[in-house]
Amino acid sequence: MYKKIDGSKSFVQMEREVLDFWNKNNIVDKSFALNEEGEYFTFYDGPPTANGKPHVGHVLTRVIKDLIPRYKVMKGYKVLRKAGWDTHGLPVELEIEKKLGISGKEEIEKFGVEEFIKECKDSVFTYSSMWKDMSEKLAFWVDMENPYVTYHNDYIESVWWALKQLWNKELLYKGHKVIPYCPRCGTALSSHEVAQGYKDVKEATAFVKFKVKGEENKYILAWTTTPWTLPSNVALAINKNFDYVEVKNNDEVLILAKELVDSVIDGEYEIIKEFKGEDILGLQYEQLLPFYTPEEEAFRVIHGDFVTLSDGTGIVHTAPAYGEDDNIVCKKHGLPMINLVDKEGKFIDCVEPWKGMPVKKADSKIIEYMDEKGILYKSEKFTHSYPHCWRCDTALLYYPTDSWFVRMTSLRDKLLENNNKVNWYPDNIRTGRFGKFLENVIDWGISRDRYWGTPLPIWECECGHRECIGSISELKEKGIDVPEDIELHKPYIDKVKLKCSKCGKEMKRTREVIDCWFDSGSMPFAQHHYPFENKEVFEKTFPAQFISEAVDQTRGWFYTLTAISTAIFDTNPFENCIVLGHVLDKHGLKMSKSKGNVVDPFDVLDSAGADASRWHFYTASAPWLPTRFSPEDVEETQRKFLSTLWNVYSFYVLYADIDKFNPLEYKDFVSENVMDKWIVSKLNSLIKDVEDHMDSYRITQAALAIEDFVDELSNWYVRRNRSRFWSEELREDKIGAYVTLYKVLTTVSLIAAPFVPFITEEIYNNLVRGLDKNALESIHLCNWPKYDENLIQKELEREMDEAYKIVKLGRSARNSVNIKNRQPLSSMLVSIKTLPEYYGRIIKDELNIKDIIFGADLSSYVEFNIKPNLPVLGKAYGRYIPQIRKEITSMDQMKLAQKIKQGEKVIINIDGNEIELNEENLLVTMKGLEGFAFAGEGNIGVVLNTTITDELKEEGQLREILSKIQNMRKEKEFEVADRIKLYVSGNRMLESVVEKFEDIIRKETIAEEVIYNEEREYVDCKINGEDFKIEVEAIK
């Protein structure tokens, strides 16, 4: 009836067989085709770059992004699962530069832009097979046969349409600003790109003396972390409201903020004058490094709101060419800009000592030069966060350049309004990391002076007229001799000229391409080639109900999606977003090649399998928290959950196959067994709870609810009901056990199917398809199970849960005194009020005790030790510790311990101070007195009587003997139904135990005969420390 389970087969082998089944039967495509008439549920797949290898972080994103759509398909929704590839931008260009052995724009131009573009296009899918392989092994089901690709003409055309909308709304403009600039890549970067590349660096800073004009030995003391900007200084900024002083130090008079004198001035000093900052506004000084002197008036003290007293001297050197704040304040005061750095980040010729030198490398040389000239007060190393290029890792410069911008500052309020409509997981992202970024939003520098990207569709005429093109048809309509099959990339698009509608001359396209993040942020509409095609599909699937990516994307994709959607559609682009934490190594450290702690996801998939990897990420921690990931972690997950589920499934198949039991013949059978009713109630509660969690994106809670249920199914239901399956005749009680376990296994497989798609498919194919060839072909084509409120009995669940909890506490108490469960004990006391007798029998049987007393006062049997947790309580109330100890000692120790363990507040009053005692600031230990063992949790405590009489000792020996015999049957690979002969010898005392309990032994081990002291080979055993010889033999 059922396919026999191969115990030697690994989960990985099973998963490969399931993959073959899916591929041969087109199960993935059939899943995509489900629910054609259903309501749409949309999720967006943030596009990875296929010219980079996938890593463990991508395993996390894929298993989260796969789970929700699977669940929604089972719930009847039509889910579009379109894969995408992010193909433009610096990441691709840098890889090609490496491949070709060239570096920088000049060498690209020499190589040839057309050939360079071809190389970029050919490279973008370098690792696509690796991505597809990982996705298939993980069962990440997205349509990879028809993906959206950001370099395709259709996609670019939709992006052009979006840019035209911005143009029409006057949100796209050209400006000359000081913005972040990568000298290595030769292009400006946007604020969200900059936010992804900050690093803590330790660099030399300079305290510099600017000589006051017309004064001897009087200097204004300023501090800078970027000495290379000093040749371009035009002003010194102070805060007019701060207190400043003149300080005499080493025969020089230095001006600086009063509050910072002690931290800055070395040696002895004398304050000779105090004044407000406003008193020195306009004070002139001599140019510090006069390599280039501007014609305009400069070199004076001005007010700047950005000046603080947190570090430095309270006086800020200001170079408007290299700082946004500097640029704004200097423009306000009519000061000139001195730019002495070229676009490669090197000093120009007039800076004679360092001409042609990269500016960051010149810092130390400039400090040495100033020291020689006597204008350096001192230099110190300083650690600060400095932006680096997010792709090539070069330190960025703030640099004046022409660039195209999207006017995001005008949309700030709308961005915040749309952000507030999103359900963020975790919720603090809304007002924290993402919300703060939006509050401080600046205009988006969208243009890149590079090659491989979506060309900015703006044409300019020398008369000053500009035109933005929003489609290929518009390009052909307005362009001159546009090829029919026009390729929209550089250099082909640059050959297209437009006729100026103002003066009639030829218009040329501006040379820039756009930020590749604009490409990915356009995917909600561009993936459908909207508005040129699929208008209805886009309108039905926008905004998305769900997206999920790593926390870094709060500065990346989450932002660009929000920015573009707000600017064009005036709404939020997604409704629910799970923000994923970082994946760490087994020690909780960030993975890096330099540390040698990088885990290869393919190694883990090949050793432990996809289901285990998926389940680990669902249960190890909330998705937004950092997660440790290692082969050992995944293997532990496999053992704890998958193996438990598999063992229950194997148990059912083994016995159902022996009995040729077909549950389809008992569809209407209703079991009256209490355990069956309990597990069915728990099953229906599980469906309801998991559904509630999943509808609210509480993935970890949903997965842990399933894990807890499977644990109870295995370690409580099956454990308590094994004898029902072992009984020889197929009576009602056995039928009830089979019907119940079958129902539970098939239903829990449906519930777990979105989480662990492989093992659930295997179980479904054997238990459901194996019996009914008309059943749906795959579990992943099935609907989500419906719960039945009439089958949920909360009182029954509470009672059984309490019984199970008492059993677990009883086991814990036994362990605390090293008494095995096979050794019977006389009695157990339980603190809670009585449970129905049925549960008492279960507890006694499980714990191997003779008697149980409910509602007992345990205080006479337990020793309590309650004392302050000094590192916590001492820190807050150190001087009161002796009084606190005294107060604790005077209280009822058991009641105090119970309150603390149950999380109740306990307030004591010491010298008028109310002090709360809790589990954090108290150390509570409880143990049984001599002859007793104690364990407690929450409101339940248990005490075992550990005195063992001779009669109890004999029963314990019986249990040990039975265990040894059953293990020998397994080792000899006897079938469950095989009858045996039992031979014992070598210990008269233990032989008498066998004689006394022979009937029980024969029944439990299916022994036809027990033979004593026969001459033969035996297995030497230890029974509670006693030597004994046992042998078993199958009866042919």
Curated annotation (Swiss-Prot):
PROSITE patterns: AA_TRNA_LIGASE_I. One of its GO terms (cellular component) is cytoplasm. Its cofactor is Zn(2+). The keyword Lyase does not apply. It is an enzyme of class 6 (ligase). ATP binds at K593. The keyword Flavoprotein does not apply. Its EC number is 6.1.1.5. Pfam families: Anticodon_1, DUF5915, tRNA-synt_1. A motif ('HIGH' region) lies at residues 48-58. Belongs to the class-I aminoacyl-tRNA synthetase family. IleS type 2 subfamily. Monomer. HAMAP family: Ile_tRNA_synth_type2 (MF_02003). IleRS has two distinct active sites: one for aminoacylation and one for editing. The misactivated valine is translocated from the active site to the editing site, which sterically excludes the correctly activated isoleucine. The single editing site contains two valyl binding pockets, one specific for each substrate (Val-AMP or Val-tRNA(Ile)). This is Isoleucine--tRNA ligase.
